[in-house]
């Protein structure tokens, strides 16, 4: 009990992206530039979808949810990084650290399952166009979105509770700019074997959406290649290209971080986390709007309304 009380009274020290202060100053500027872009870009996507009745369909409903997840995902960590840098502090409370870890895991899972739902939506639209409105009904969309949030939160809870039960024996220095599960497990002086097993189980849960995405796109392209039409092929690539780009960005960075043994983790890996915590959520609005004529038109309409009013 004494050890548990000591842990709950412990303040962690977030070492930042690197151990070099000059490099952390550079990352501060990067975060300071990226965060407003993330908020503005994703908020514009949500507003454009809400304002344009032509975008009131499953594909854009799922995209709006992805933008919402990305806004919250970035807001869990980046404001704390910016505030600590400005205040000259690196501290975060034990409770604050656990909350940060909980939301990061929950939102990462919600993000991955939303990406899977978007791939499923495209597969149904291209492979079963006559049954699309029946399969992707408003009720189905709500269930897919609700399911992604429920799975995310239920996946994050056991990891958070297990981490809360660990002792840290005064070890305070977290080798990252936020409370990630891997540096916390390496920091603990308790037996973390069960925690590690649960973490790998969580990685498995995280991998399921990727499997769904692969199956969905195999179905999409097998359908498209059966139709001897260059126009159909081009349309499929335009429709799915943006989503596939986001999937590669998201899973490429997270797999490089978590699909490996805990012992291989090093402080240098914090640089990788910048990619999926800050860069990917900022790029998503540009990726989805640059190659999507309907989204471009909706954004232009939104801006013209704001200017005229």
Curated annotation (Swiss-Prot):
Subcellular location per the Swiss-Prot or TrEMBL entry: Cell membrane
Residue ranges annotated as Cytoplasmic topological domain: 50-57, 121-139, 219-235, 291-309
Extracellular face of the membrane: 1-25, 80-100, 159-195, 259-270
Species this chain originates from: Homo sapiens (Human)
InterPro entries linked to this entry: GPCR_Rhodpsn, GPCR_Rhodpsn_7TM, Olfact_rcpt
Record function comment: Odorant receptor.
UniProt GO MF annotations: G protein-coupled receptor activity; olfactory receptor activity
Protein name: Olfactory receptor 1A2
Covalent S-S links between cysteines: 97-189
């Amino acid at each position: 009990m004494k050890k548990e009380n000591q842990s709950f009274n412990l303040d962690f020290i977030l070492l930042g992206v690197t151990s070099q202060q000059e490099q952390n100053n550079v990352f501060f500027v990067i975060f300071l530039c990226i965060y407003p872009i993330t908020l503005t870009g994703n908020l514009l996507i949500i507003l454009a979808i809400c304002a344009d009745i032509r975008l009131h369909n499953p594909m854009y409903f799922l995209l709006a949810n992805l933008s919402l997840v990305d806004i919250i995902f970035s807001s869990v960590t980046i404001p704390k990084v910016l505030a600590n840098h400005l205040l000259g502090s690196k501290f975060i409370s034990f409770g604050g650290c656990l909350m940060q870890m909980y939301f990061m895991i929950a939102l990462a899972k919600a993000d991955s399952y939303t990406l899977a739902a978007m791939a499923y939506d495209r597969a149904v639209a291209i492979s079963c166009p006559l049954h699309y409105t029946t399969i992707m009904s408003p009720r189905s969309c709500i269930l897919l979105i609700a399911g992604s949030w429920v799975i995310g939160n239920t996946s994050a809870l056991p990891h958070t509770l297990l981490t809360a039960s660990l002792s840290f024996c005064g070890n305070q220095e977290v080798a990252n700019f936020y409370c990630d599960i891997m540096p916390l497990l390496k920091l603990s002086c308790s037996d973390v074997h069960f925690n590690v097993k649960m973490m790998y189980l969580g990685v498995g849960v995280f991998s399921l959406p990727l499997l769904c995405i692969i199956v969905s796109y195999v179905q999409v392209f097998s359908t498209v290649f059966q139709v001897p039409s260059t126009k159909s092929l081009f349309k499929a690539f335009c429709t799915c290209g943006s989503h596939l780009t986001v999937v590669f960005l998201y899973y490429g960075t997270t797999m490089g971080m978590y699909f490996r043994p805990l012992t291989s983790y090093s402080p240098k890996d914090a640089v990788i986390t910048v990619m999926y915590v800050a860069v990917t959520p900022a790029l998503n609005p540009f990726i989805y709007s640059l190659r999507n004529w309907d989204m471009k038109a909706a954004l232009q309409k939104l801006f013209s309304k704001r200017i005229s009013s």
